[in-house]
């Protein structure tokens, strides 16, 4: 019987070397060590042995089982490694193949212009301030020298939510909020970019558009300071050869007030259809902060002065890129947007 066990061991070890797959290895294991396996069958013969022979024979069978199981583990590791290498070879990526190119995205022209405006004024020492788009009547009008019976309110057809709450018509409320928050610290030197809303819709107007307003409050601020800031901005935005002019105007929150024109980018001031033959194009409104607005912000108008300005980002973008219809900026036509 010992010879039979040794024969099973030798034959099994030989077959292990011939097995080439993990499936065949498992089948061989069941054939030898399974419940009906050849080595298991030898254990059933122990009943016919004498009590003295049984432990000796049992030890032989167990030693053989240990040898075969160790051999199985080694062979399984070898086959697993071989299978893995084969799989890696079959799934190997050819890095010489050209990659699939993806379409490149583009910044929206309004985003580009807003970021450029911010960068220019940050370089001049201004800080960015933001505020809510849903605003109170007080901050949007009254604190800006526009009481409820002021005729200038008719100039802005507003979107009211309640009698006292509306979508802001300008970013100027941020200036009042910043003055209240910052007082008595000086200087106040901010720009306020953001969305504003007015009930207007045509080729040059949109019910939602973007503004950037600026405010500087300190001692001895003069109109010449405002002009110098806006001249520097215009040249950095539209080119070093640009000039500006200030025309008298009216805004309730500034006194004196001025419209700011820049020399035409197309004709250089000679006159063309873009500037309507004048050589100048209006770009923003500005002026010295009205004393009442300073008082509403918590500052002494007898000790301090300031200037403010405001521009429509869409208008700046239209002038910078030669866009004739504002609605193109909101149509989401990729053929148009990919030009920028």
Swiss-Prot record:
Query: Any keyword Oxidoreductase?
Result: no
Which HAMAP family did the record assign?
Phe_tRNA_synth_alpha1
In the UniProt record, the gene name given for this protein reads: pheS
| Cofactor(s) required, per the database record | Mg(2+)
Write out the annotated subcellular location: Cytoplasm
Q: Which GO terms describe its cellular component?
A: cytoplasm
One GO biological-process annotation of the entry reads: phenylalanyl-tRNA aminoacylation
Q: EC number(s) of the enzyme?
A: 6.1.1.20
Keyword line: Aminoacyl-tRNA synthetase, ATP-binding, Cytoplasm, Ligase, Magnesium, Metal-binding, Nucleotide-binding, Protein biosynthesis
One example GO MF annotation? magnesium ion binding
Cofactor: binding comment: Binds 2 magnesium ions per tetramer.
Source species, domain of life: Bacteria
- CDD domains given for it? PheRS_alpha_core
* Keyword Ribonucleoprotein set for record: no
Would you tell me the protein name for this molecule?
Phenylalanine--tRNA ligase alpha subunit
């Amino acid at each position: 019987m010992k010879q039979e066990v040794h024969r099973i061991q030798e034959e099994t070890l030989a077959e292990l070397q011939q097995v080439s797959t993990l499936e065949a290895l498992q089948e061989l294991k069941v054939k030898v060590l399974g419940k009906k396996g050849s080595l298991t069958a030898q254990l059933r013969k122990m009943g016919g042995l004498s009590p003295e022979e049984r432990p000796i024979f049992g030890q032989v069978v167990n030693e053989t089982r240990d040898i075969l199981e160790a051999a199985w583990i080694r062979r399984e590791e070898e086959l697993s490694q071989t299978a893995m290498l084969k799989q890696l070879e079959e799934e190997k990526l050819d890095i010489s193949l050209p990659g699939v190119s993806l379409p490149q995205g583009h910044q929206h022209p309004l985003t580009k212009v807003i970021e450029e405006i911010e960068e220019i004024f940050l370089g001049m020492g201004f800080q960015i301030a933001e505020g809510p788009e849903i605003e109170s009547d007080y901050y949007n009008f009254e604190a800006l020298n526009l009481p409820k019976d002021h005729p200038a309110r008719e100039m802005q057809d507003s979107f009211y939510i309640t009698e006292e709450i509306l979508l802001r018509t300008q970013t100027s409320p941020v200036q009042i909020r910043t003055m209240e928050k910052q007082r008595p610290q000086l200087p106040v030197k901010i720009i306020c970019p953001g969305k504003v809303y007015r009930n207007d819709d045509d080729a040059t107007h949109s019910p939602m558009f973007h503004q950037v307003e600026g405010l500087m409050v300190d001692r001895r601020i003069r109109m010449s300071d405002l002009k110098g800031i806006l001249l520097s901005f215009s040249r950095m935005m539209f080119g070093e050869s640009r000039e500006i002019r200030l025309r008298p105007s009216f805004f309730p929150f500034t006194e004196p007030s001025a419209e700011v024109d820049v020399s035409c980018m197309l004709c250089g001031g000679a006159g063309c259809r873009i500037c309507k033959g004048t050589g100048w194009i209006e770009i923003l409104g500005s002026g010295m902060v009205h004393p009442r607005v300073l008082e509403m912000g918590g500052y002494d108008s007898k000790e301090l002065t300031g200037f403010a300005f405001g521009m429509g980002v869409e208008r700046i973008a239209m002038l910078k890129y030669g866009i004739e219809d504002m609605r193109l900026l909101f149509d989401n036509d990729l053929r148009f947007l990919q030009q920028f």
